[in-house]
Amino acid sequence: MRKVKSARKLGRTASHRKATLANLSTQLLLHKRIETTEAKAKETRKHVEKIITKAKKGTVHAQRIIFKTIRDKSAIRELFEDIIGRIGDRNGGYTRIIKLAPRYGDAAKMAVIELVDYAEMPAEQPKAATTDRSKRVKGSKKKAVAEGTSAE
Protein backbone atom coordinates (compact mmCIF):
# COMPACT_ATOMS: atom_id res chain seq x y z
CA MET A 1 0.00 0.00 0.00
CA ARG A 2 1.33 3.46 -0.93
CA LYS A 3 2.26 5.83 1.86
CA VAL A 4 2.83 9.56 1.80
CA LYS A 5 6.44 10.68 2.16
CA SER A 6 6.97 13.27 4.86
CA ALA A 7 9.69 15.37 3.23
CA ARG A 8 9.02 18.49 1.18
CA LYS A 9 9.98 18.38 -2.49
CA LEU A 10 11.11 22.03 -2.62
CA GLY A 11 10.39 22.12 -6.36
CA ARG A 12 13.51 20.13 -7.20
CA THR A 13 14.55 16.73 -8.45
CA ALA A 14 15.72 14.23 -5.84
CA SER A 15 19.42 14.79 -6.54
CA HIS A 16 19.06 18.59 -6.55
CA ARG A 17 17.08 18.47 -3.29
CA LYS A 18 19.73 16.25 -1.69
CA ALA A 19 22.51 18.64 -2.77
CA THR A 20 20.56 21.69 -1.57
CA LEU A 21 20.01 20.20 1.89
CA ALA A 22 23.65 19.14 2.12
CA ASN A 23 24.81 22.66 1.21
CA LEU A 24 22.41 24.36 3.63
CA SER A 25 23.45 21.97 6.42
CA THR A 26 27.14 22.60 5.74
CA GLN A 27 26.67 26.36 5.79
CA LEU A 28 24.65 26.18 9.01
CA LEU A 29 27.39 24.16 10.72
CA LEU A 30 30.09 26.58 9.53
CA HIS A 31 28.31 29.91 10.08
CA LYS A 32 25.90 28.89 12.90
CA ARG A 33 23.15 31.05 11.36
CA ILE A 34 21.77 31.29 7.81
CA GLU A 35 18.91 33.09 6.11
CA THR A 36 16.79 31.09 3.68
CA THR A 37 13.16 30.41 2.80
CA GLU A 38 10.89 29.01 5.47
CA ALA A 39 10.35 25.67 3.69
CA LYS A 40 14.09 25.12 3.20
CA ALA A 41 14.72 26.08 6.83
CA LYS A 42 12.21 23.51 8.07
CA GLU A 43 13.77 20.75 5.96
CA THR A 44 17.28 21.80 6.96
CA ARG A 45 16.25 21.62 10.61
CA LYS A 46 15.24 17.96 10.23
CA HIS A 47 18.48 17.18 8.41
CA VAL A 48 20.82 18.97 10.84
CA GLU A 49 19.18 17.66 14.00
CA LYS A 50 19.71 14.07 12.84
CA ILE A 51 23.33 14.84 11.95
CA ILE A 52 24.06 16.43 15.34
CA THR A 53 22.43 13.53 17.19
CA LYS A 54 24.65 11.07 15.29
CA ALA A 55 27.71 13.23 15.94
CA LYS A 56 27.10 13.17 19.71
CA LYS A 57 28.21 9.52 19.70
CA GLY A 58 31.68 10.76 18.76
CA THR A 59 32.77 7.57 17.01
CA VAL A 60 34.69 7.18 13.77
CA HIS A 61 31.69 5.33 12.38
CA ALA A 62 29.48 8.36 13.10
CA GLN A 63 32.01 10.61 11.32
CA ARG A 64 31.94 8.40 8.24
CA ILE A 65 28.15 8.29 8.13
CA ILE A 66 27.96 12.09 8.43
CA PHE A 67 30.65 12.52 5.77
CA LYS A 68 28.33 10.78 3.29
CA THR A 69 26.04 13.82 3.33
CA ILE A 70 28.31 16.66 4.43
CA ARG A 71 31.35 16.49 2.18
CA ASP A 72 33.22 19.37 3.81
CA LYS A 73 36.00 18.38 6.21
CA SER A 74 36.07 21.78 7.90
CA ALA A 75 32.33 21.56 8.66
CA ILE A 76 32.74 18.07 10.13
CA ARG A 77 35.73 19.22 12.18
CA GLU A 78 33.68 22.17 13.45
CA LEU A 79 30.80 19.83 14.30
CA PHE A 80 32.84 17.31 16.27
CA GLU A 81 35.22 19.75 18.00
CA ASP A 82 33.15 22.84 18.72
CA ILE A 83 29.42 22.28 18.30
CA ILE A 84 29.21 18.97 20.19
CA GLY A 85 31.12 20.52 23.09
CA ARG A 86 28.66 23.39 23.35
CA ILE A 87 25.56 21.23 23.05
CA GLY A 88 26.46 19.15 26.09
CA ASP A 89 23.52 17.13 27.38
CA ARG A 90 20.82 18.76 25.26
CA ASN A 91 18.45 16.08 23.94
CA GLY A 92 17.31 17.46 20.61
CA GLY A 93 16.12 20.93 19.73
CA TYR A 94 19.54 22.07 18.54
CA THR A 95 18.18 24.59 16.02
CA ARG A 96 15.79 27.53 16.08
CA ILE A 97 13.79 29.01 13.19
CA ILE A 98 12.94 32.71 13.34
CA LYS A 99 10.46 33.95 10.74
CA LEU A 100 11.29 37.13 8.84
CA ALA A 101 9.46 39.50 6.52
CA PRO A 102 8.73 38.24 3.01
CA ARG A 103 11.45 38.58 0.40
CA TYR A 104 11.10 41.73 -1.70
CA GLY A 105 11.39 40.21 -5.18
CA ASP A 106 8.92 37.34 -5.00
CA ALA A 107 7.29 37.64 -1.54
CA ALA A 108 8.68 34.25 -0.50
CA LYS A 109 8.38 33.50 3.23
CA MET A 110 11.85 34.00 4.69
CA ALA A 111 13.37 32.67 7.90
CA VAL A 112 16.63 32.53 9.81
CA ILE A 113 17.75 29.13 11.07
CA GLU A 114 20.39 29.13 13.77
CA LEU A 115 22.01 26.79 16.25
CA VAL A 116 20.45 27.41 19.66
CA ASP A 117 23.66 27.51 21.71
CA TYR A 118 25.13 30.13 19.39
CA ALA A 119 22.27 32.62 19.74
CA GLU A 120 24.45 35.09 21.66
CA MET A 121 26.58 35.62 18.56
CA PRO A 122 26.08 39.14 17.19
CA ALA A 123 23.66 39.33 14.31
CA GLU A 124 24.54 41.23 11.18
CA GLN A 125 24.58 44.96 11.81
CA PRO A 126 21.51 46.69 10.33
CA LYS A 127 22.23 49.12 7.53
CA ALA A 128 22.17 52.81 8.40
CA ALA A 129 18.79 54.38 7.77
CA THR A 130 18.77 56.63 4.74
CA THR A 131 17.15 60.05 4.92
CA ASP A 132 14.07 60.82 2.90
CA ARG A 133 15.44 63.07 0.17
CA SER A 134 12.01 64.11 -1.12
CA LYS A 135 11.45 66.34 1.93
CA ARG A 136 14.76 68.18 1.63
CA VAL A 137 14.67 71.58 -0.01
CA LYS A 138 17.76 72.80 -1.80
CA GLY A 139 19.40 76.10 -0.88
CA SER A 140 18.21 78.08 -3.91
CA LYS A 141 14.63 76.98 -3.37
CA LYS A 142 14.84 78.00 0.28
CA LYS A 143 15.86 81.52 -0.74
CA ALA A 144 13.07 81.74 -3.30
CA VAL A 145 10.51 80.54 -0.79
CA ALA A 146 11.84 82.89 1.90
CA GLU A 147 11.78 85.88 -0.50
CA GLY A 148 8.28 85.01 -1.73
CA THR A 149 6.83 84.84 1.78
CA SER A 150 8.58 88.00 2.99
CA ALA A 151 7.28 90.00 -0.01
CA GLU A 152 3.68 89.25 0.91
UniProtKB/Swiss-Prot annotation:
Look up keyword Ribonucleoprotein and say if it applies.
Answer: yes
Q: Which SUPFAM superfamilies match?
A: Prokaryotic ribosomal protein L17
Lineage, broadest ranks: Bacteria, Pseudomonadati, Chlorobiota, Chlorobiia, Chlorobiales
Domain of life the protein comes from: Bacteria
The UniProt annotation puts the region (Disordered) at 124-152
GO BP terms: translation
User: One GO MF term, please?
Assistant: structural constituent of ribosome
GO cellular component terms, alphabetically, are:
cytosolic large ribosomal subunit
Q: Does Ribosomal protein count among this protein's keywords?
A: yes
Q: Which UniProt keywords apply?
A: Ribonucleoprotein, Ribosomal protein
Protein name as annotated: Large ribosomal subunit protein bL17
According to its UniProt entry, this protein's organism is Prosthecochloris aestuarii (strain DSM 271 / SK 413)
Q: What family, per the record?
A: Belongs to the bacterial ribosomal protein bL17 family.
Q: Self-association or partners: how does it assemble?
A: Part of the 50S ribosomal subunit. Contacts protein L32.
Q: So where does this one cross the membrane?
A: none
